[in-house]
């Protein structure tokens, strides 16, 4: 056993030395002849010499293309600018094709073109930013016609409708529960106006679908808003109505930022079918109208800082009802006590009969 173990150890050490020698031979490259090494070096040199101009031309190629593209862009930009000035810098024409004189006719030709172009784009920008008219609604109705005492301005998307998308139907709008009740209860008290930030092309058929009975008096769209800081703002001063009797309902406070105490900001409807916000809104606005509030801003100011104005109204209404019930209970209790004492007094001190 000892001899076999010694033989095994000798064999293992020999195998290790042989493996190490083989690995060393594989790691070092075989020696090359001097002429073979010189030939390889000359090939590498000629290859580098031939690749040098090609790499230089390839590096110069993109820069040349960039220069050409830059010159073309400049040429197109200059041509487009000249075309815009030529098109929008001419005089306006009437229906017969004759030029209409303006205040720039006495200027040099180039100055005329530039000033008319500037005026055109300035007016176009003003058209986008400002409402289409300083009086968006006609004058209130006069007798014998009936004009509701208040005006209710409603947003469409997020207040009355919720946009939904599905693979089967695509985009569609869901009606909020309580729309019919809201219109029926408030139409005798409020002049209902839909004032939405949507375009007329989108909103007109939607309004027809939510109001088949014609409770809505007027419709105003995005072009009637005032564009400020990226928001479409509804300017109450352009409605041709008394601001003291106008209530704006929207899901964005930025929509009535110019008159913050004329607005009620609701949370955007998420499409929940169990929603009851419009019923609460109807009760809130009906309470204002039936109490004959002269200036709605004095009421809405108390709810301006509330996160949920309708919930705050419900809590205050519940608290007032409890206080009223408590007052009536105390009054009933005191009246019963007075009645008891009066009956007791009449029994103890009966009145003498007159002869």
Curated annotation (Swiss-Prot):
Comp. bias regions, Polar residues: 47-61
Classification via PROSITE patterns: FCP1
Modified residues (Phosphoserine): 343
Gene Ontology CC annotation, any one: TIM23 mitochondrial import inner membrane translocase complex
Localization of this protein: Mitochondrion inner membrane
GO biological process, alphabetically ordered: protein import into mitochondrial matrix
Topology class, membrane: Single-pass membrane protein
Residues in the Mitochondrial matrix compartment per record: 45-67
Region (Disordered): 25-61
TM stretches of this protein: 68-88
InterPro entries: FCP1_dom, HAD-like_sf, HAD_sf, TIM50
Function (record text): Essential component of the TIM23 complex, a complex that mediates the translocation of transit peptide-containing proteins across the mitochondrial inner membrane. Has some phosphatase activity in vitro; however such activity may not be relevant in vivo.
Family, per entry: Belongs to the TIM50 family.
Oligomer and partners: Component of the TIM23 complex at least composed of TIMM23, TIMM17 (TIMM17A or TIMM17B) and TIMM50; within this complex, directly interacts with TIMM23. The complex interacts with the TIMM44 component of the PAM complex and with DNAJC15.
Protein name: Mitochondrial import inner membrane translocase subunit TIM50
Originating species: Bos taurus
């Amino acid at each position: 056993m000892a001899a076999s173990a010694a033989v095994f150890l000798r064999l293992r050490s020999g195998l290790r030395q042989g493996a190490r020698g083989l690995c060393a031979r594989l790691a070092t490259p075989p020696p090359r002849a001097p002429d073979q090494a010189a030939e390889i070096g000359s090939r590498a040199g000629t290859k580098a010499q031939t690749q040098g101009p090609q790499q230089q031309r390839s590096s110069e190629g993109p820069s040349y293309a960039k220069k050409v593209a830059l010159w073309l862009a400049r040429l197109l930009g200059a041509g487009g600018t000249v075309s815009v000035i030529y098109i929008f810098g001419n005089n306006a024409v009437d229906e017969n094709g004759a030029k209409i004189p303006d205040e720039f006719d006495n200027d040099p030709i180039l100055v005329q073109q530039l000033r008319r172009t500037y005026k055109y784009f300035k007016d176009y920008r003003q058209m986008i930013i400002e409402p289409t008219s300083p009086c968006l609604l006609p004058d209130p109705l006069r007798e014998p016609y009936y004009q509701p005492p208040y005006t209710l301005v409603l947003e469409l998307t997020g207040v009355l409708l919720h946009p939904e998308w599905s693979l089967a139907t695509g985009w569609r709008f869901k009606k909020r529960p309580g729309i019919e009740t809201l219109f029926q209860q408030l139409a005798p008290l409020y002049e209902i106006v839909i004032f939405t930030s949507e375009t007329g092309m989108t909103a007109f058929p939607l309004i027809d679908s939510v109001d088949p009975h014609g409770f809505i008096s007027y419709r105003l769209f995005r072009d009637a808003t005032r564009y400020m800081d990226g928001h479409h703002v509804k300017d109450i001063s352009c409605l041709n109505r008394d601001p003291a009797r106008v209530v704006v309902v929207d899901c964005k406070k930025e929509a009535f930022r110019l008159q913050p105490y004329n607005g009620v900001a609701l949370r955007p409807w998420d499409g929940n079918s169990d929603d009851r916000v419009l019923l609460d809104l109807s009760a809130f606005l009906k309470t204002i109208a039936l109490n004959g509030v002269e200036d709605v801003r004095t009421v809405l100011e108390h709810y301006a800082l509330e996160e949920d104005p309708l919930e705050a109204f419900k809590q205050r209404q519940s608290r007032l009802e409890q206080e009223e019930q408590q007052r009536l209970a105390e009054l009933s209790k005191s009246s019963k006590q007075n009645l008891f004492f009066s009956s007791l007094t009449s029994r103890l001190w009966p009145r003498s009969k007159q002869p």
